[in-house]
Amino acid sequence: MNRPAPVEISYENMRFLITHNPTNATLNKFTEELKKYGVTTLVRVCDATYDKAPVEKEGIHVLDWPFDDGAPPPNQIVDDWLNLLKTKFREEPGCCVAVHCVAGLGRAPVLVALALIECGMKYEDAVQFIRQKRRGAFNSKQLLYLEKYRPKMRLRFRDTNGHCCVQ
């Protein structure tokens, strides 16, 4: 199956890598790709299809937060995701958080869009921003979820330059 290449989404002080899931056969290449982008945490939002031990051996923490394909994330995963980002980007400025689902077109982009929205971006702008790099991202159910999502501005803190930053 031909999968889209990983894409980096950078906004203000946040860096994300959206990617598809590897197999045990492609795990070495996948791990090298993560290291190239400086990934320290990988969030897996689909069922496990590979052994995470080799990834963790390379110093990349793997979190398993699966939710249904095509569906919006449950509230608990949204809370966990935003809390993770708040901590990561404060403690490791410049780090990159990777997130993957099966194809990297639905669940993973939704979580990145939520982070952008929580930082003050309008949902339409967040969708367009991600789709510029990840064509085909989001299905209609996910778009409706993002449209109705009401941010609590959990990632919106201003630094002295007026930039969104995580504190």
Swiss-Prot record:
Pfam families: Y_phosphatase (PF00102). Gene3D superfamilies: Protein tyrosine phosphatase superfamily. Residues 165-167 form a propeptide. GO terms for cellular component: cytoplasm; cytosol; early endosome; nucleus; plasma membrane. Farnesylated. Farnesylation is required for membrane targeting and for interaction with RABGGTB. Unfarnesylated forms are redirected to the nucleus and cytosol. Inhibited by sodium orthovanadate and pentamidine. Substrate binds at R107. A lipid is attached at C164 (S-farnesyl cysteine). Keywords: Cell membrane, Cytoplasm, Disulfide bond, Endosome, Hydrolase, Lipoprotein, Membrane, Methylation, Prenylation, Protein phosphatase. The keyword Cell membrane applies. One of its GO terms (molecular function) is enzyme inhibitor activity. Changing C165S: No effect on interaction with RABGGTB. It is an enzyme of class 3 (hydrolase). Its main location: membrane. It catalyses: O-phospho-L-tyrosyl-[protein] + H2O = L-tyrosyl-[protein] + phosphate. Transmembrane segments: none annotated. A processed pseudogene with 96% sequence identity was found in the BRCA1 (113705) region of 17q21. In contrast to PTP4A1 and PTP4A3, does not interact with tubulin. Interacts with RABGGTB. Protein tyrosine phosphatase which stimulates progression from G1 into S phase during mitosis. Promotes tumors. Inhibits geranylgeranyl transferase type II activity by blocking the association between RABGGTA and RABGGTB. Belongs to the protein-tyrosine phosphatase family. This is Protein tyrosine phosphatase type IVA 2. It comes from Homo sapiens. The lineage of its organism: Eukaryota, Metazoa, Chordata, Craniata, Vertebrata.
